[in-house]
Amino acid sequence: MKHLLGLRDLSKEDIIKILNLAKDMKTILKSETKKTPHLQGYSVVTLFYENSTRTRTSFELAAKFMSANTTSISVQTSSVQKGESLLDTVKTLEALKTDVLIVRHSVSGVPHFIAKNCSFSVINAGDGMNEHPTQALLDMFTIRERLGTIEKLKIAIIGDILHSRVARSNIWGLSKFDNQITVFGPQTLIPPYIENFAKVASSLEEAVSGKDIVIDLRIQLERQKRGFITSKQEYYKFYGLNEDIMKFISDSTLIMHPGPVNRGVEISSEVMQLKNSTIDEQVTNGIAVRMAVLYLCTRKEGIYR
């Protein structure tokens, strides 16, 4: 059985395999029909226990463009509201002949639990504060497309590192390619032991200076159970990407953000519109990357053996 549960245990070779295939899938997206029969006859189900626009829509379009039969389950109107357990939901989907389940959950490890208790493929679309593997893969795809490489780069990740599954997946993925990773954010939002995996900068200016890529993160207020920041205004003043901080950033430095963006909090509208901003590209590339992942997870050789 083949799954994509995270980048921590994914090999460098498998990441390259996904990115290479995503390049081919992007060619299909540029065609007039945007259609391929690779998943014809397959049943792909999305099950999101958390809100999503980009990831859910991107996966659904990816499956449709590959001719899969797609079903989207709304947790709010499903039997979950009647007290159905996660395991029973999984067994129901199994009985309905699901081939691939794309799942997002607020609890870390849920995709791994499902993968151990089902016969279909499982793709992690974000689990708690753990990982968001396809977001990191599309970030890496965008970097490689823009810069020609994902190796030996200087990368800054700015913002709510503590609660960010995007940050974790990017650190796991990018660190496999001999990149120098620096993180910066409010001290309350920097996780313990992060020094084992990345350098912690002492200022925003230090963090972004001389970098090839700056990845800005969303403040995840929905995961914060106490006051990690004093106010959005203060956050923007000290940690936001604006015109003032751009003085320390090269015109060739990629400005990235996984979305959704809080304009005027994490990043200004003006910075988002710069030529070196890749925010819209990341959304487009997400479809190609997810097409590649769906293809590999439904093939015998797959991502995992």
Curated annotation (Swiss-Prot):
Binding site for carbamoyl phosphate: 54-55, 104, 132, 135, 259-260
Signal peptide from the UniProt entry: none
Binding-site list for L-aspartate: 82, 165, 218
GO molecular function, one term: amino acid binding
Family the UniProt entry places it in: Belongs to the aspartate/ornithine carbamoyltransferase superfamily. ATCase family.
Quaternary structure note: Heterododecamer (2C3:3R2) of six catalytic PyrB chains organized as two trimers (C3), and six regulatory PyrI chains organized as three dimers (R2).
This protein's name: Aspartate carbamoyltransferase catalytic subunit
Annotated organism of origin: Caldicellulosiruptor saccharolyticus (strain ATCC 43494 / DSM 8903 / Tp8T 6331)
Gene: pyrB
